[in-house]
Amino acid sequence: MAVSDLSHRFEGESVGRALELVGERWTLLILREAFFGVRRFGQLARNLGIPRPTLSSRLRMLVELGLFDRVPYSSDPERHEYRLTEAGRDLFAAIVVLMQWGDEYLPRPEGPPIKLRHHTCGEHADPRLICTHCGEEITARNVTPEPGPGFKAKLASS
């Protein structure tokens, strides 16, 4: 199958399926806050300026999807915090890429609002996608999409 054959829509595509679950604005902002250590409902509501009913429904959905665990931290009154699961933590790269894109193409005159400091070396990090086989940076120009084992071409409508 030629590369150009993959340029049309195809059934079950991973990006589309993922965006169906986490592509909504508030969901991505809740994830960002969680990556930066915010776990409690009230702090999420204050930091984001999100309506409380909207926050409740998004958190409920994120728990149902397995991206957060709802964990009690107080019994009187009963209160819960929201902790990222492994599946939730694995979305970190997506948030960082969006942050980097915003810094590059929607810059603020005073510079980036958030910088990431790497714990191991103590320097500001500039995260990149790296090939685990050769160590080269991965870009849209040096990879080729190929059908994977789950590929199913979308049938054209008659």
From Swiss-Prot:
Sequence ranges assigned to domain HTH hxlR-type in this UniProt record: 13-110
Keywords, alphabetical: DNA-binding, Transcription, Transcription regulation
Molecular-function annotations in GO: DNA binding
Record SUPFAM superfamilies: Winged helix' DNA-binding domain
Pfam families the UniProt entry points to: HxlR
Cleaved signal peptide residues: none
Protein name: Uncharacterized HTH-type transcriptional regulator MT3179
InterPro entries according to UniProt: ArsR-like_HTH, HTH_HxlR, WH-like_DNA-bd_sf, WH_DNA-bd_sf
PROSITE patterns: HTH_HXLR
